[in-house]
Amino acid sequence: MSNKLFENGRFFLGCNWWASHAGTNMWQEWDEAVVEDDFRRLADAKITVVRVFPLWSDFQPLRMHFGGGQTPREIRLGENPLPETEAGRAGIDEIMVERFSTLCDIAERYGIRLIVGLITGWMSGRMHTPEAFLGKDLLRDPLVVSWQVRFVKYMVRHFKDRVAIAAWDLGNECNCMSSGLSRSECYVWASQITNAIKAEDASRPVISGMHGTLPSDASVWNSRDLGEILDVLCTHPYPLFTPHCNTDPINGMKSALHATAESVMYASTAGKPCFIEEAGTLGPIVSSEKIAGDYVRASAFSAWAHGLYGFVWWCANEQSALTHTPYDWESIERELGFFRIDGSKKPVLESMSELASFIEGLDFDALPERITDAVCILTHGQDVWANAYGSFILAKQAGLDVTFA
């Protein structure tokens, strides 16, 4: 199984995944049989890439122990001193490492390639922070960042020889883990984590894992900066959360082109490959299952036709039966899966399987380079996304293809 996810030019279709029985609690409530069944069903449906998340608070369960006057005294693994082992020095729970290794074994058996979101401290509207770091700035505090670097270096060093792993991801939307950062502080954090990954494994691409970055001076998480640091950029183009997008029916032209337009803007302005790492309708509050299937058919096909690398759905499984946070906080997190609670397929998965079969049937791996008719120059002091998106849509209506600078 090749792990060259962004080099052979073949478009991939994938999903973000939490185990169907437990969601974000899967590492604590580990069930190998469920994980195996999840991956078997995904492989049967022609899903070839899965983004997975070693939850930060489970894998690095550090706790600060305090002395008199609430003086910080010692970081431990729960109540136990840090062992004098490689894992102990990184603050890693070795039981979780064994479970992640089993996950890699299962992925290899089913020919599924993994994107690993390393610093997953934010997920679906809830923070998952090691107790030792509660109340600290998770992207600026030197104590926190030093332990993040140890965590990343250990995980990458330990798993870099696993065939199933195709790419490393900084983590899930790490720009949601702090606020008030300067552009320079964002640059420094992203560089530190990327350099920690590459110090252990220079053979695999590193992906941003971010959402809502822009190539504008006003964006502190700046996609041009991330293009300097990282190998691959990504978009998380949910219409509900993206300015100027939640205006039309989800199966209309404007919505269908949103993910492509945003990804083309990132790739062309940053000079790095881009793919759609999280796509979704956010469930029945936005559209019916049938209309969601129509949306995916148009959006994923558009991404392929424009030379993007892949389309990854959020997410594999419905989570409407789960009662822990964030699922009992957020109605939009509960009914997003390919599979219903009873295991039956939704139209979204049928649409993606159909596109996978279509691409498999072609006698070439990659489309020729996209021909563009014009360049839209995004200048300083403007709403770059409004202008890029509007220009992209208007150009399509006029029969033109544009890129951005």
For the regions a protein language model found, what residue spans apply to each?
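Active-site mouth of glycoside hydrolases
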Residues: 2-230
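Short, solvent-exposed loop/turn elements at domain surfaces
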Residues: 20-27, 243-244, 383-385
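Beta-sheet entry/capping signal
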Residues: 49, 113, 166, 205, ...
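Charged helix-capping and loop-helix junction motifs
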Residues: 97-99, 255-259, 290-298
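Glycoside hydrolase catalytic-domain groove-lining segments
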Residues: 183-188, 192-195, 199-285, 318, ...
